[in-house]
Regions:
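A basic, amphipathic helix-loop patch mediating RNA/tRNA/ribosome contacts
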Residues: 9-51
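A detector for short, charged/polar N-terminal pre-domain segments
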Residues: 1-11
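Short, charged beta-turn/beta-strand-edge "cap" motif at the junction between a beta-strand
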Residues: 62-67
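Short, low-complexity, polar/charged sequence segments that are solvent-exposed and flexible
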Residues: 23-25, 58-61
């Protein structure tokens, strides 16, 4: 499981996917999120701007990202 360490209080979902290298651009992030391919804490998330906080887990195409403070 990859970890992203927060610099601020939160990171937005689209930014987290890009930071982890799971998508190449914001446009790609928007597409995969709106198509329901991304899970946050086990539930499908459709908002690219969803704020992720310490302890949240993002799942996408078999990869998981843990958000850490």
């Amino acid at each position: 499981m990859e970890e992203i360490v927060l610099r601020d209080e939160f990171i937005k979902l689209g930014q987290a996917l890009k930071a982890a290298g799971l998508v190449e651009s914001g446009v790609e992030a928007k597409i995969v999120i709106t198509e329901g391919e991304v899970l946050v804490n086990g539930e499908v998330e459709y908002q690219r701007g969803k704020k992720l906080y310490d302890g949240d887990v993002v799942s996408f195409r078999g990869e998981e990202i843990l958000i850490k403070q």
